[in-house]
């Protein structure tokens, strides 16, 4: 897939105010500081499309970007930022859950995982929740360029082993680096394949 057009449409905290229409939506979510904005900018080829912040957990909005005038890329708030406080964390959880459970246009959720870290309980529990609610999702491992030698392969294998404790069938997964544009083609082709399947129905 070639992205010829990517434009910001709207930010909000209320799923009912998301864009009308039937365009499929591909949402991106992950823990704070997982590299989500950088990944979105890399995928779209637009350096400043999604704002990157030096402060983890700053974004508390659902951001819609219209891609090729045919589908939406949705940037969801990051979860698990402890310094946000209990009230802030509850507010974020409500925004995320309302979008994921109520937004009929959401076609697939991409869960971003920092490839440098060992499996995190918060991510595993979140994916378990997705499974319990029948939400289609894929995993994107980020920051692959930060690991040298065979460390990346070791970390990914460890993560998949952990997932197999919960899942009979593993979700699709992609290995990416925003710095090196690694995984861009694979992720976009995956989105394109789903779009073609939807259009054929």
From Swiss-Prot:
One Pfam family cited in the UniProt record for this chain: MMR_HSR1
Binding site residues for GTP: 30-37, 57-61, 75-78, 142-145, 175-178
GO terms assigned for molecular function: GTP binding; metal ion binding
InterPro entries in the cross-refs: G_ENGB_dom, GTP-bd, GTP-bd_ribosome_bio_YsxC, P-loop_NTPase
Cofactor(s) essential for the protein: Mg(2+)
Record flagged with keyword Magnesium: yes
Database matches in CDD domains: YihA_EngB (cd01876)
Binding site for Mg(2+): 37, 59
Keyword terms: Cell cycle, Cell division, GTP-binding, Magnesium, Metal-binding, Nucleotide-binding, Septation
One BP term from GO: division septum assembly
Highest taxon listed in the record's lineage: Bacteria
Positions of the EngB-type G domain: 22-197
Family membership noted in the UniProt record: Belongs to the TRAFAC class TrmE-Era-EngA-EngB-Septin-like GTPase superfamily. EngB GTPase family.
HAMAP family: GTPase_EngB
Physiological role: Necessary for normal cell division and for the maintenance of normal septation.
Protein name in UniProt: Probable GTP-binding protein EngB
Lineage, highest ranks first: Bacteria, Pseudomonadati, Bacteroidota, Bacteroidia, Bacteroidales
């Amino acid at each position: 897939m070639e992205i010829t057009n990517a434009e910001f449409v709207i930010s909000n905290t209320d799923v009912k105010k998301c864009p009308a229409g039937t365009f499929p939506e591909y949402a991106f979510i992950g823990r704070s500081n997982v590299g989500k904005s950088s990944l979105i900018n890399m995928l779209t080829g637009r350096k400043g499309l999604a704002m990157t912040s030096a402060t983890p957990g700053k974004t508390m909005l659902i951001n819609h970007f219209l891609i090729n005038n045919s589908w939406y890329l949705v940037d969801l708030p990051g979860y698990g930022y402890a310094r946000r406080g209990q009230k802030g964390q509850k507010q974020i959880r409500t925004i995320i859950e309302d979008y994921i459970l109520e937004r009929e246009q959401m076609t697939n959720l991409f869960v971003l995982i920092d490839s440098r870290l060992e499996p995190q309980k918060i991510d595993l529990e979140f994916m378990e929740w997705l499974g319990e609610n029948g939400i289609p999702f894929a995993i994107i491992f980020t920051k692959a360029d930060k690991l040298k030698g065979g460390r990346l392969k070791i970390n990914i294998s460890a993560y998949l082993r952990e997932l197999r404790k919960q899942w009979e069938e593993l979700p699709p997964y992609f290995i990416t680096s925003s710095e090196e544009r690694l995984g861009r083609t694979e992720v976009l082709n995956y989105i394109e394949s789903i779009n073609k399947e939807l259009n054929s129905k």
